[in-house]
């Protein structure tokens, strides 16, 4: 454990790392080797356990010929308390980095805060900082639901030190309805600027979001969603439709134009449309058709128009073929699904156990299993 000895103290409610791993490892994975195709070398990994069968250290060989080590110290109740990660880069420009992660829990065993220290050969004189930096902190409501999460810590540009008391880089606030369903994330940011929030989202069930009118649904289905991101500050939404079996049939996309509250106007006048429509299903609930629009050079044509066929003349749940009839799909440059097997031949093949043995859309003609 060498490098970890200096950190093997006894913080509150913690157990020290044992000097040696346990020999009682029956039924536990202690060693793995992974073959790298085209090379003679293997990548190996060794697992070390304590006498309670808890994984206390993993040592593995990395692609540089160096080693990655992860050592974990547990609390008396078995929760990870401190984790030390050591990465050694061998060869040219050899480097070593340490990352120490500390977890703080409340009386109910829930993670409240995650702190880190980082040391690197080429940074800050290769010295481990004396204090931790908080990377995330969470707060729960009386029902145990996540109420607020803060991420990162800001530095004072005047002296390049972290603010005290801490100022987070980002804040995330969560609200729920009486059933515990998520209603929104950062609702205040939807209509106002906030330097510590970069994303907002609202979900509509039986009630509207703050800037949109959704047809209310009383069966738990999400009637629509509204969101806003930091990049362009634009507010966008989807209105969802379902069939009698509560299966999604369409998602109508629109962008905010003007107005407020239930009078807010959303449309696709900016020629941006990511709507999904025409979702149909077979008797087994398998998807049969789907149409999707997307943005191409300031226009939003249909980029996907799928038809799904299944094995055994549709009397199966095994997908046989996907046909894309959209005109925009012929270029194959959109980064989405590519219909790489045009014709009557099935796209997908399976063995007797149901394992995929061919995917002609991706140019994979054979897959074998041991």
Task: Set out the residue ranges of the language-model regions.
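Acidic/glycine-rich beta-solenoid
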Residues: 2-50, 55-370
């Amino acid at each position: 454990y060498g490098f970890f000895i200096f950190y093997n103290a006894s913080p509150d409610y913690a157990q020290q790392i044992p000097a040696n791993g346990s020999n009682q490892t029956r039924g536990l994975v202690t060693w793995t080797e992974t073959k790298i195709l085209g090379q003679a070398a293997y990548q190996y990994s060794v697992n070390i356990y304590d006498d309670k069968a808890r994984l206390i250290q993993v040592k593995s060989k990395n692609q540089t010929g160096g080693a990655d080590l992860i050592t974990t110290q547990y609390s008396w109740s078995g929760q990870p308390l401190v984790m030390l990660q050591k990465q050694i880069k061998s060869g040219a420009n050899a480097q070593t980095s340490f990352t120490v992660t500390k977890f703080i829990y409340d009386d109910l065993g829930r993670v409240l805060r995650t702190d880190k220290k980082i040391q690197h050969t080429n940074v800050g004189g290769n010295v481990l900082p004396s204090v931790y930096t908080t990377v995330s902190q969470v707060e729960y409501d009386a029902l145990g639901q996540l109420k607020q999460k803060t991420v990162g810590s800001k530095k004072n540009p005047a002296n390049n030190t972290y603010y005290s008391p801490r100022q987070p880089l980002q804040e995330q606030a969560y609200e729920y309805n009486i059933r515990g369903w998520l209603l929104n994330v950062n609702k205040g940011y939807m209509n106002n600027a906030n330097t510590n929030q970069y994303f907002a989202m609202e979900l509509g069930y039986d009630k509207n979001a703050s800037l949109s009118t959704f047809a209310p649904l009383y069966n738990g289905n999400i009637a629509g969603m509204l969101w806003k991101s930091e990049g362009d500050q634009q507010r966008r939404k989807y209105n969802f439709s379902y069939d009698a079996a509560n299966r999604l049939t369409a998602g109508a996309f629109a962008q905010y134009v003007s107005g407020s509250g239930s009078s807010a106007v959303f449309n696709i006048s900016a020629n941006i449309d990511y709507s999904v429509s025409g979702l149909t299903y077979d008797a087994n609930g398998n998807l049969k058709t789907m149409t999707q629009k997307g943005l191409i050079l300031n226009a939003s044509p249909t980029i996907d128009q799928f038809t799904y066929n299944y094995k055994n003349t549709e009397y199966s749940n095994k997908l046989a073929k996907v046909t894309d009839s959209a005109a925009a799909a012929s270029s194959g440059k959109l980064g989405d699904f590519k219909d790489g097997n045009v014709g009557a031949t099935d796209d997908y093949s399976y063995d007797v156990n149901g394992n995929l043995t061919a995917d002609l859309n991706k140019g994979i003609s054979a897959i074998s299993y041991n």
